[in-house]
Amino acid sequence: MKSLILVAAGGAIGASLRYLLGAGVYRLTGGPTGFPVAIMMANVLGSIAMGFFVVWAAHRGLTHLSPFVMTGVLGGFTTFSAFSLETVTLFERGEIWQAGLYVALSVGLSVFGLMAGLWVARGVYL
């Protein structure tokens, strides 16, 4: 139960940070840019933070903070950081084919899933 509360609190923080990043980019650019700059920035920054935290926490004996930081804060900030970590872990284990398959399936099926959700919802509501 404690881990669930930590994940939820971290998720609230991460989602709030992503919102603030988006608002900041919107303000700097004067409005929508036509390219998802804020989301890309969140994904890249979250992936950097995930990579740093994994090593830092292991060296400092702070892996007990992983639910709060990795699943919560970084998961709320971006789900892409976990995807990046899993991909690199597969590469580091020498599982190159599995890493490639994971990337292709994750991206392809996620995009297909979104399209399927749109198709179903449009059929129901339009």
Swiss-Prot record:
InterPro entries: FluC. One of its GO terms (cellular component) is plasma membrane. Na(+) is not transported, but it plays an essential structural role and its presence is essential for fluoride channel function. GO terms for molecular function: fluoride channel activity; metal ion binding. The chain crosses the membrane at residues 5-25, 37-57, 65-85, 101-121. The keyword Transport applies. Keywords: Cell inner membrane, Cell membrane, Ion channel, Ion transport, Membrane, Metal-binding, Sodium, Transmembrane, Transmembrane helix, Transport. It comes from the Bacteria. Fluoride-specific ion channel. Important for reducing fluoride concentration in the cell, thus reducing its toxicity. This is Fluoride-specific ion channel FluC. It comes from Roseobacter denitrificans (strain ATCC 33942 / OCh 114) (Erythrobacter sp. (strain OCh 114)). The lineage of its organism: Bacteria, Pseudomonadati, Pseudomonadota, Alphaproteobacteria, Rhodobacterales.
